[in-house]
């Protein structure tokens, strides 16, 4: 009897193993290249990169948006949307970035003005959430307190591919701050 049970169990394990190795011939590759499936441990509250305060939304945005820099697998900061390291003024206050070519999901080009829009939204007191971490940008603190309009933020699009960031004070940690 024991020998029969062992044979049945061995046969079952082999059958399950072979079934797991097989392919699903009914699956379709239609739009498979255009779809990303991810699991989160909680409900997403937003996909607005300037208006989140929960971990699931933050994790998801880290997967779908990219900053001027990104954190590599070795936990080191590397270029993201920046095509090359920025030109930095002698006083360490002005950073000029050239953006690499990239497109939004609708096919339109990512432009420097998109970054300006996002950074302005981050410090705009009328948007609800205001990021104190953006206080490194020129005038950010005064904008957050309502003393200046968001247009005075030290972030400017010089053209479609060139972004200029002016700081209040030198910030050697700026690349880490500008990760997606």
Regions found by a protein language model. Give the residues of each.
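N-terminal lobe/hinge region of extracytoplasmic solute-binding protein
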Residues: 39-90
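Surface-exposed binding/hinge segments that line
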Residues: 132-180
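Solvent-exposed, polar/charged alpha-helical surfaces in well-ordered, non-transmembrane soluble domains
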Residues: 45, 62, 66, 93, ...
